[in-house]
UniProtKB/Swiss-Prot annotation:
This is S-ribosylhomocysteine lyase. It comes from Staphylococcus carnosus (strain TM300). Binds 1 Fe cation per subunit. Fe cation binds at residues 56, 60, 123. HAMAP family: LuxS. Homodimer. Its cofactor is Fe cation. One of its GO terms (molecular function) is S-ribosylhomocysteine lyase activity. Keywords: Autoinducer synthesis, Iron, Lyase, Metal-binding, Quorum sensing. It is an enzyme of class 4 (lyase). It holds the Pfam family LuxS. The gene is luxS. GO terms for biological process: quorum sensing. It catalyses: S-(5-deoxy-D-ribos-5-yl)-L-homocysteine = (S)-4,5-dihydroxypentane-2,3-dione + L-homocysteine. Belongs to the LuxS family.
Amino acid sequence: MPKMNVESFNLDHTKVVAPFVRLAGTVEGANGDVIKKYDIRFKQPNKEHMKMPGLHSLEHLMAENIRNHTDKVVDLSPMGCQTGFYVSLINHDDYEDVLNIIEATLKDVLAADEVPACNEVQCGWAASHSLEGAKEIAQDFLDKRDQWDKIFSE
């Protein structure tokens, strides 16, 4: 296959083993700032996916809560394939700390009693949420914490 512009299109999705957290890209700005993008893969590509209401609530919960654990977050976004998220951090290069930040954020999800910004003023599809679904996805990922640094099958 020809090399593509999008990093994830060059990843052989048949060779990865979810769940995992991998460095997906690094960009250096003109003034020396470095942004690292991480692939937080919750589900095995082309085998399973997160259902939208749970994924949507997980996005809200993670996007809000991750910023309580680091001030380096540029963005946290869901993947269109519904198998994971991307998180981008600026001037932060400690992979183990990234794993700890994600773990703490997902523990916040489990402790949540509501989905932040789950209303028509703050959300573009407020009817599509599931706190319970988000908690199930988070718990499943946390249960496999020891696998997060293993991206490919051996």
